[in-house]
Amino acid sequence: MNRKVILLCLIFLVPKDSLQIGKKECIVDLQKTTCFQHPESDLFEKAVVCIKKYEGWHSLKHFPYVGYGHRLLKEEAFDHRISEKFADSILRKDLRLKCELFRDFGSDSLILGTLAYNVGEYRLLGFGKKQKSTLIRKLEKGNRKIYDDYIAFCHYKGKVVPSIKKRRMEEYRLLFNCKNINNKSYDKCR
């Protein structure tokens, strides 16, 4: 009986969340996300600021999106009338979850998580008949020349959207480190 109580206490001490990818549910330990050892690091903060800048505030007309682009889930009991502080905490939680999906990419998990926050992880990782993106395939092979592939995520209905292209360029500039990855130095990443 004491073991059950201790186990329950341990479960509640470690913040966890879950997300569904296709039909699989992933349990994520938010303290072990690999965006960075300290998720409130400078780069994580830059990502949050960048997302806020380009997402803007989502009001009732943006339903089912609230705050800074959070998509409401069926079980969530709030709407667009949330505080900025609450929206900030949701953004950070969502970004950590996205980063966790890309944990195998090490320090690139932040830029990939930031992109997935906007376009969805399926566009990067593939799902069903949709293949992995060229961006992911290049990074898996160790190819750091991903600028064009990253910026290419700026289309809507087949057309380049200048504001989204500007966003991608800023995200890349702020968050992608092409040098000294895995003890290798890369002179050019474009």
Stretches found by the model and what they are:
Residues 46, 61-63, 107:
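Extracytoplasmic
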